[in-house]
């Protein structure tokens, strides 16, 4: 399947959104917990529609991993007496809106990070977000870890991936070398364009994004190997909603045990992730332990 590439950005606007998120959480976070949701009969989830392969639009119709999983979540919720309402928002401001209590949860492909864990708990992860790299197809200069020494790398400015670049630096230090020039971009499509034209030697992104890039542009790029410890994608839940977190943990257990989660992972991400944590991620310390940081 071909689909449009998301320009989901981690620009200054995204940094501002995170700052707003942190401030909003400290002042006004009052998202409904499960008892309140059941009382009003509906859970409102914030999603986006420009982040393939999670949520995106093809010919005016929603597609993606979360489009299908939302159907399962709706059925699971109805069995417990309430409905699910979807609100589509741009990524910028989505987490801030959830933190401020305007929506009950973010139902999108959010990476677990230290900053976000200070505002949210995360339901059990639905995908790996370990960091891999893409290189130009046929570039035989890069074959192993040592061959990354001194090479120019591209990442998105302000991203979780940039924040974990020291892990690659530590790996390369064992080969008595370091990363080369680090180029920061406002969006990944810009970085991929510079990789294609030779300005970069490789680009680091989360595993699913690299898989999606190679799936849709395999004539230009190929997948490298992991350059970080484990990483995770999950749904952010306000910390003041522990019952909702428990509800979503139960939902994840159901789709995991039934094989539905693995089937959707294979379909949309190109591989299943049987070794993901099965518990919610609720603290920076727990995240670092799970990720081997």
Each predicted region: which residue ranges?
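Extended ligand-binding regions for polar small-molecule ligands
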Residues: 64-78, 139, 143-147, 151-160, ...
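Acidic, polar ligand-binding/catalytic clefts
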Residues: 71, 75, 83-147, 221-222, ...
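Ligand-binding cleft/hinge of the Venus flytrap
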Residues: 56, 71-83, 161-184, 214-218
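Periplasmic-binding protein-like
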Residues: 49, 127-135, 207, 214-253, ...
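A ligand-binding cleft/hinge motif common to bilobed small-molecule-binding domains
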Residues: 93, 109-119, 164-172, 189, ...
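Bacterial N-terminal signal peptides that target proteins for export
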Residues: 2-17
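N-terminal signal peptide c-region/cleavage motif recognized by signal peptidases
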Residues: 26-29
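Extracytoplasmic small-molecule ligand-binding "clamshell" domains
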Residues: 32-108, 118, 184, 247-248, ...
